[in-house]
Amino acid sequence: MPIITLPNGDQKSFDHPVSVMEVAQSIGPGLAKNTVAGRVNDRLVDACDLITEDSTLQIITPKDEEGLEIIRHSCAHLVGHAVKQLFPEAKMVIGPVIEEGFYYDIWMPRPFTLDDMAAIEERMKKLIDQDYDVIKKMTPRDEVIKVFTDRGEEYKLRLVEDMPEEKAMGLYYHQEYVDMCRGPHVPNTKFLKSFKLTKISGAYWRGDAKNEQLQRIYGTAWADKKQLAAYIKRIEEAEKRDHRKIGKALDLFHMQEEAPGMVFWHANGWTIYQVLEQYMRKVQQDNGYQEIKTPQIVDFTLWEKSGHAANYAENMFTTHSESRNYAVKPMNCPCHVQVFNQGLKSYRDLPIRLAEFGSCHRNEPSGSLHGIMRVRGFTQDDAHIFCTKEQIGKEVADFIKLTLDVYKDFGFEEVQMKLSTRPEKRVGDDALWDLAEKSLADALDAAGLEWELQPGEGAFYGPKIEFSLKDCLGRVWQCGTIQCDFNLPVRLDASYVTEENERDQPVMLHRAILGSFERFIGILIEHYAGFMPPWLSPVQACVMNITDSQAEASEQVVAKLKENGLRAISDLRNEKIGFKIRERTLERIPYLLVLGDREVEEGTVNVRTRSGKNLGTMSVDAFIDLVKSAVAERGRYIVE
């Protein structure tokens, strides 16, 4: 007779096998009404599943993270139910949960339209209103094959073939529709009311472009209407902040078909890029890095020796000349080892920190390209530290401090850090892994911030720390990384002379702070919605005259601002001053300076911000000091 132990320690005894739902009902009708599933002995199960022995049980409701994930998974099945009713010719493939939502891959003889998506969503709502129970049946393998054969679901049959060890499988019935899944799923469609379909895109069977093309319907689902509304509002705000739209509106960059995944930087965007590069150059110089420059195109034999050819060839652009094969570098590390290898190195020379604003190219699939966030040609703030095993800890600690300071300068205060440790398949002895992992963990602890352990998620050649930023919409962007490498120095014959006058391989620390400049600028654009802090604004001030009589004085003010290092322009058009102010405000220029007869006579400027705040009249020198003070605060300064 099972004794059920609840999370608060209470126990309930039953004289027969009991389902999760029955336990919930024995506790109270309110809990039973909200029961989505259960966690029995730390394993998620359906509400209908029986408990036959003494067990621990947590009732899962929509308020739990697992409950929300189950709701989303069940919504994917509901998509299948609606699609098969509306489009019987469709073939269902897979429908997993993703962050904040779900999708379903479907084969159709024709593309889905937006009208189709609206019809599918409407049918889903009607099915939910029927308030039907979702029925789970553990089904023998042969019967599963028969079910999907009778229904002509060839992709489901392929998935069954992928699981030869499974003797029985879970089939979930939504009325006449049936889907295969490990579960768990909601017991009733009443839990699925707070959902929305969001978009349609293309996909490939098994994610391989050589296979048949599928269509992917995305959606989101939440515990209640309030959460759904908040999500929709956040998505609408994200769409307003789309870096592609803002990039066009502010004349920052463009992309075009003749160069897919390559950025055409316009003057305004290139100014932001240069500010980033100049800032990072000084930061790295101040922290003991030597800046180098390595070739764009390198003989393919180096990539074979480094191991990249075996593991990365399909993402590399290659070329051929004079009977030699070359690759356009997808990353900088092998070239940095070549620089390190020039000349004999002693332990006294270490650590050596080599930095490069390295231009890299990767042959990313065209379907994955996204504005300047996912490109084929990009520049990294890349650096490699060559050090002894004993120096790992200090180098990592210094890098963590440097990285967090840089992020604060760009206005990012919330940073998530994750330590990934040794996988099963790896190079290097355990003692070296022990030392490296402890060095990284100690450095994280010394920073005094929370961090997350990801066991087994490190690369085969060493543990790593990842740094992720949280933007104003709560989205998380992985940017920085520091990665121990015990492999590449061995493969590329990097060595130094130890204190005992012997040869040893240095540890190589791969590190980046911003990552790709292109992607980081995209993040900045969306984080600030184009309203860059003054230090990053392509134009920091626009000087405008009221009438032609102030034109010369306006140009003189612009000249003085430029002499003092400000990025300034004039607007001398024969337009009303209100029109010029509105237009320049739309360009997100932080400061708008107006000159009338009084300002010319007094040698002053009237200053207002892009948000409309009037800062009053001040001397040009006072305004210069104001901007320089704002620039010095970098991302910590907000233009009111």
From Swiss-Prot:
Stated name of the protein: Threonine--tRNA ligase
Record text on subunit structure and interactions: Homodimer.
The UniProt record lists the keyword Cell cycle: no
Role according to the record: Catalyzes the attachment of threonine to tRNA(Thr) in a two-step reaction: L-threonine is first activated by ATP to form Thr-AMP and then transferred to the acceptor end of tRNA(Thr). Also edits incorrectly charged L-seryl-tRNA(Thr).
Molecular functions (GO terms): ATP binding; metal ion binding; threonine-tRNA ligase activity; tRNA binding
PROSITE patterns for the chain: AA_TRNA_LIGASE_II, TGS
InterPro entries recorded: aa-tRNA-synt_IIb, aa-tRNA-synth_II, aa-tRNA-synth_II/BPL/LPL, Anticodon-bd, Anticodon-bd_dom_sf, Beta-grasp_dom_sf, TGS, TGS-like
Keywords assigned: Aminoacyl-tRNA synthetase, ATP-binding, Cytoplasm, Ligase, Metal-binding, Nucleotide-binding, Protein biosynthesis, RNA-binding, tRNA-binding, Zinc
Family label: Belongs to the class-II aminoacyl-tRNA synthetase family.
Annotated segments matching region Catalytic: 242-533
Keyword Zinc attached: yes
Domain of life: Bacteria
Cofactor(s) the protein requires to work: Zn(2+)
TGS domain location: 1-61
Originating gene: thrS
PANTHER family: THREONINE--TRNA LIGASE, CHLOROPLASTIC_MITOCHONDRIAL 2, THREONINE-TRNA LIGASE
Provenance organism: Acinetobacter baumannii (strain ATCC 17978 / DSM 105126 / CIP 53.77 / LMG 1025 / NCDC KC755 / 5377)
